[in-house]
């Protein structure tokens, strides 16, 4: 099954960043699909079409134009994507639409532990020392449902 998700459409869904503090920060997202030509060879290609089971990598680039201190970036995970992991250890996830936050392995849905498939939002706290650099990237991966 092929999902008709052009990179621009998918990027727009994944690229909405919510800033919880006052600094002027701009974000942009790019979506790539991971391709394997052998067990040891993997490469990223811009995502123009995605199919169920494709592993995608979303790169969120942020640029700080003004302000001091740290800030928070929140991204909704598209419903067509099952969250897998973030390349940064400073992420928190939500499994309830952004109402509560924590780490996989600590969050619960009813009587069970939440899994990466349950993630609805990803949030990164950018500390003051990283924010002072003025720009950065955050990467997370997922599987197309």
Write out the residue ranges for each language-model feature:
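Bacterial N-terminal signal peptides
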Residues: 1-9
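Exported/extracytosolic protein signature
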Residues: 10-145
């Amino acid at each position: 099954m092929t999902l008709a998700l052009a990179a621009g459409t998918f990027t727009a869904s994944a690229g909405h960043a919510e800033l919880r503090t006052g600094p002027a920060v701009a974000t942009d997202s790019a979506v790539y699909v991971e391709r394997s030509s052998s067990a040891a060879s993997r490469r990223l290609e811009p995502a123009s079409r995605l199919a169920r089971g494709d592993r995608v990598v979303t790169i969120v680039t942020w640029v700080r134009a003004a302000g001091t201190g740290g800030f928070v970036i929140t991204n909704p995970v598209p419903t067509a994507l099952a969250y897998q992991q973030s390349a940064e250890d400073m992420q928190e996830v939500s499994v309830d639409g952004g109402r509560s936050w924590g780490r996989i392995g600590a969050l619960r849905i009813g009587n069970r532990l939440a899994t990466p498939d349950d993630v609805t939002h990803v949030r990164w706290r950018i500390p003051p020392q990283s924010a002072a650099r003025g720009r950065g990237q955050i990467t997370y991966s997922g599987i197309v449902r």
